[in-house]
């Protein structure tokens, strides 16, 4: 009887240890996913040729809270009028003015007064944005009836597949009411894509 009680006590002690371990693992994983990094699956072909449908990616969340996003960063966010996460690339930053011209993106200084009538001399203040991540036939053209933008706050983001139109260029597929509809506010950002796990391991 004594031996049975010892075995029974040992069994329940092991069960308790296992439960404690599982609870600890659960909270560690939850903390990591909420505050450090979380996995996502790419569901669209809009970031081709750099990301494809069913790619597994890891999104780092620390930059969103403590760091700074840079031009060219690939981010995951929830669009202001959508519920599912998007993956897109930051093209320009707060308080920048940009121009779409000749299938290119130009970053221009703020001292150009009239964006609707850009003169030849004004091009001295504009710089063509190099985009080595794009295929030649996916270069940018102005769509949705607008060729110039002033980003007051938030981030202007675009697909790498520029033939898709549900990005900042077209207010994520809804009607554009003012400049705020074109950008992603800070509080909608989830994080920066750091790693692709599948089908090929790639760091960004």
State where each predicted segment sits.
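A short acidic/basic microdomain associated with nuclease active sites
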Residues: 44
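Soluble "head" domains of membrane/secretory-pathway proteins
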Residues: 2-16, 20, 35, 41, ...
């Amino acid at each position: 009887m004594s031996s049975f009680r010892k075995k029974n006590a040992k069994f329940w002690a092991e069960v308790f240890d296992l439960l404690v371990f599982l609870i600890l693992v659960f909270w560690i994983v939850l903390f990591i996913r909420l505050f450090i990094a979380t996995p996502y699956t790419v569901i669209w072909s809009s970031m081709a040729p750099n990301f494809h449908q069913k790619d597994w990616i890891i999104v780092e969340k620390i930059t969103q809270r403590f760091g700074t996003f840079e031009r060219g960063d690939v981010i995951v966010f929830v669009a202001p009028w959508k519920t599912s996460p998007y993956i897109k690339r930051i093209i320009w930053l707060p308080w920048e003015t940009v121009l779409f011209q000749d299938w290119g993106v130009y970053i221009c200084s703020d001292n150009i007064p009239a964006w609707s009538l850009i003169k030849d001399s004004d091009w001295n203040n504009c710089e063509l944005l190099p985009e080595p991540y794009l295929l030649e036939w996916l270069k940018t053209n102005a769509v949705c009836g607008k060729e110039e933008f002033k980003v007051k706050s938030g981030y202007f983001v675009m697909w790498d597949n520029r033939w898709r139109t549900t990005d900042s260029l077209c207010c994520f597929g809804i009607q554009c009411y003012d400049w705020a509809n074109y950008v992603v506010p800070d509080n909608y950002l989830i994080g920066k894509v750091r790693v692709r796990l599948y089908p090929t391991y790639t760091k960004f």
